[in-house]
């Protein structure tokens, strides 16, 4: 157990993931831009400094205590910014880590330009070594222990979420900090969604959850209660699928907690008076990755040769230079390859590991990227090539839509197979050489890969452009703003129409 002291309170962090993490946060408290790369000794406070802090604290009490009677009164000094903790939901992959550093430096520079004390800005992937911190709930006790007494608000943003600090100050001033607030741009389902386990099936629009791209905020009062609940209730979790929906459910707590409060200034579409903005759904890192550097593996079986395979051939197959269909039988008309692994009704772990072994063999061209999809996956290879330009194939990269399993109990993350699993050659080589393997041929391949990568320290890299389900299973507000890369399943839809409407570009850049 690690005991942290903040003000007059002691906060015990019993989770072993957080033991020994106090030193990095003394650095983060000072907003040292070099904190991601070095941790310095915490400065000592002089008597004058302590007296100054006491005076500031007294002023803040007066200000916030009278805020409800003077809502139009301008913010006093830099109190709001200095009491704001911004958590950038960064990732360990080098591309995403760099994006996180850049966002942090931009926020701190903007604060300096305002002539005010800066907020605390943290990179999520640096808070501890635990891979599951991306699900937010596991890290709330640590944030509360370190910043619970100094912060009034906690803002969670993505790497490409812009923060307009002076507008954000005005927005947060509207909400009394002693109360529990959960703020964001509201999304809702238009129909019962498999992604959300068909929650609120009688009226899916009745439950709101925040758009992660616009950012979402917790008041310190709510944050502290959630952290204490996580510490005391021995919470269990199985699958983490749609992060902000599940966080909203956790906060709402069957009506015992607050629902999301819609804040129009939390934006994804640029307009006047935005406190946050988000525009970079599909990054531009230069020319797309070459078609000749990607190998596509399609998993199929005999009963779908005449049903699903024709959809692949009529939609996205033409954008692949190297593509093979792997089945339980050989069919020269497609053609398919029999890897000698019996077909299974579920899981397909044996087939996937056989695909990876073939990818590293001399039987196929030596390229940097392996893309493994189901025969009912719809995918835009031109958009994928544009995204892959951002990643270094010399790194161990496992990319796709990230899910989690048992993350409140030191579980693991994985990329969902239906949305497509993208692996660098380096990642495949490290995985196979580790000796990690299927416990049975019908084990869930995507989950086994995630467990294996977690065990050898390879991070799972998330992109919201991959989708395990169909377009209608996601919020229309968000999905229409994306340049999606994939969808999954042919149930009750015209898959060709889905591909045409959601994934096909009028002028794909296919010359490379």
Spans of model-derived segments:
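Secretory-pathway lumenal glyco-enzymes, predominantly type II signal-anchor Golgi glycosyltransferases
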Residues: 2-512
